[in-house]
Amino acid sequence: MAALFTTPKRNDKTSGAHFVEPDVRRRTLLAHGSWRRVTRRIVVGAVCALTVSSLLMPSVSLAAEWVDVGGTQYNAGTAAGDAAGTWSWDGADDMKLNGYNGGAIEAAGKLNVSYEGNNTVTNDNGRGIKVKDGANENAELNIQGDASSTLNVTSSRDAITSVGNINIDGAGTVNATSTEHDAIDAGGDVTIKGSGNVNATGDSDGIRADGNITIDNSGTVTAKATEDQGIDANENLIIKGGGKVEASSIKDNAIWADGNIEISGGSQVKASSEEDAAIDGKNSLTVTNASLNASGVGYGIYVYKGITLDGATVTVRASSDGGEASALFTDEDDIVIKNGSTVDALAEGRFSVAISTSNFYSDEAGGHIYISDSVVKAIARYAETGGDGPDHYSGDQNDEIIPESEGLNIGIFAQTEKGITPATISIVRSKVTAEGDTAAIFALAMSADGKAIGTIEIEGSTILTPEGGKVIDYRNKEELSNGDIYEAGQTIGTGDAVIDSPYNEAVAKSTVIVPPEEIKPEEKPGETKPEGSKSEGTKTTKTVAAAATGAKTTGILAATGDTSSAAIVAAALAGTAAIAAGAVVSRKRS
């Protein structure tokens, strides 16, 4: 039997597709079940450094050195404004807008803009509001307005921009629109606070910062993009304050962060992309006591360094017409769902996983999924074709020699090779509903000696469906030109046999795992139970893999065979595990 999970090296010759050690950080499934290697995303971002000139810069005076309003420059030290009182500047750092309707505003140094009433800044051939470094002062732009006031900024280039930080505060509404570039762009950090609303619409990015983006706001922040990201943070993205954040992009990620993504404090975040992942991050994602709704193409959520959902409500959708789809995925780290979280993940594609993690590196500790005291629904299937229901590729498999393999779909999937510890899926006191056209739940470990075994552990919960369902073992061996690869893991299924194919009829395509309080066995007439007794269905179960030495499965390893039906589908499961791919390119900046 050919190995199910390995990808051959260039010089290997085998009848199947199988796993070997990947030599790149990011990988993807091929439509026919094998892997192609792609380079890991190289993020092009600003590198912050102190220059000699900044070290020698004299102490700042915290005031704009000059301002330019509608094409006329005014120097510091003298107050300025128009006769109608629609704008005024105190000659230092404070500017007031009250019914302003005019051209671009620019300043050197620090500028505080407060607005009242309805204000409009327009520039069809440049930036709207721009602050740059002065000769003796770094750029900083602060914008604030009251609840009944609006600031509209429309321009061809960046609408609101600063070489340094941008701070938006207050209860007013800021509408920033760029027809060719970013709506809001900072060379430093972007911070949005208060209770107001911010609507940023850019042809490039909606909201972008070379530093951190912090949204600590109880109002609504909307960031829309066409070519690039809705929200683009070259460092960390922090969302808190209990408000609503809606990010979207047509051609790119709705949300991208080169650092960590943290969502908390009752915030409600919605991210959607029409052509790419909804959320893409180079580090970790943490959602604590907040809600997140993400919908993307190829990926719903993809981050490299772990996902933690703590008291969170998360809905994720990923689709791909005939291709690869992964709803909730992390590479090289763990997925932790805990403390009353509710997670609903759906992936539709020829090769798809709803919740998945993978780890292929010996110095990394990831590749595990931990679910405790939570409710999780994970469904992976092939996209519907307009008929009565979705096409279930795995249902097309039969006992023919070398049948055509058309796809693979797994609800919850963990995979490791060379990791510090083997793949583990742990379910504790939780309700888990998992469905996959191929398998509902699968844990897989690969090694050169067969000692690493992927495990499924269930504690404080019971397998309700399928009837007679249990954790069953998977074993396979692939003989490659450079040595043998052993694949060992577990899945949910029926029977006592050790399987060597995910398409085995013993594998459960749908499973429901529930804590004791959700099991209500029928009471027989006249039956009484002693106080404190438990029904059979409420017994706590814990299942782990047997030790490699002396285990009942020792010696039951499928050998490579040219006529094996598993040979054609061999790499499909593997590819699904690292579905996290797609060639991600550097974002060019103007």
Where are these regions (language model features)?
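Ala/Thr-enriched low-complexity intrinsically disordered regions
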Residues: T6-T7, T14-A17, T28-A31, A277, ...
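Intrinsically disordered, low-complexity polyampholyte segments enriched for Lys and acidic residues
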Residues: K9-K13, E21-D23, N217, N289, ...
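Sec-dependent, cleavable N-terminal signal peptides
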Residues: M1-A63, S590
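A composition-driven surface/loop motif
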Residues: F5, V60-E518
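Sec-dependent signal peptide cleavage junction
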Residues: L56-W66, A558-A566, S586
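A cross-kingdom C-terminal cell-surface attachment/processing module
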Residues: S565-R587
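C-terminal low-complexity, Ser/Thr- and acidic/Pro-rich disordered "stalk" regions positioned immediately N-terminal
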Residues: S501-D562
